[in-house]
Amino acid sequence: MRFKKTISIALALGLLLLSLMAFQMFQKTQLVMFDSISFNMPLESFEKVFGKPNEIVEETETGYHNPWRSKDPYLYKTGRLFYDYENFKWKGYSGRVTFTFSKSHRLQGAAVYFPVTSKAQQKEIFYQMIQDMKAEIEALPDYQSMTTDTVGLYDDGYRYKVKLKGQMIELWIDVYPTEYEDDDNPDNNQYNIRIDQSRLE
């Protein structure tokens, strides 16, 4: 009897833990820079708030009819979607944003690209944008604390790992410069500041 009681208690605790994990997975976490938009938001609800995108891209991956020999490749749709919006504005900056939706069509993350005209302007705006981002993070209603790591090809960007009250899953925000330089034709050079948002799951 005592053994059965112990098993019952263990099963009950296991179910409670699974319920808490599921709650954490689907608990609303607001995205920084976007009012009324949260992670795990259903696609239909998202469109009502943010509107129709300029472009929708369906993710595809390569599969093989004979996976043992990687022969007869074919493309298949994974179910994930990318919603692209042009003319996104934030604190006087203009750019574009791509939202990523999971196979179940729930919001997974966002990537924002702010173009700049030169590397000098990129450096100037980047450090101002960092200050703006810190202020935005600390203004979150459930903000608790934040740690910072370096990211980017040359460790010239920052990753903010944000702890939120009542949640075990961290909010990660990466802010870093990106560049494409054409040695043959400098007029094709492209400089951006990119901001990624995701939840560590």
Each language-model region and where it sits:
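Long, charged/polar, surface-exposed segments that mediate recognition or autoinhibition
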Residues: 86-155
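N-terminal Sec-pathway targeting helices
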Residues: 1-13
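N-terminal leader/targeting segments
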Residues: 26-103
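An acidic-aromatic pocket/loop used at catalytic or ligand-binding sites
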Residues: 156-201
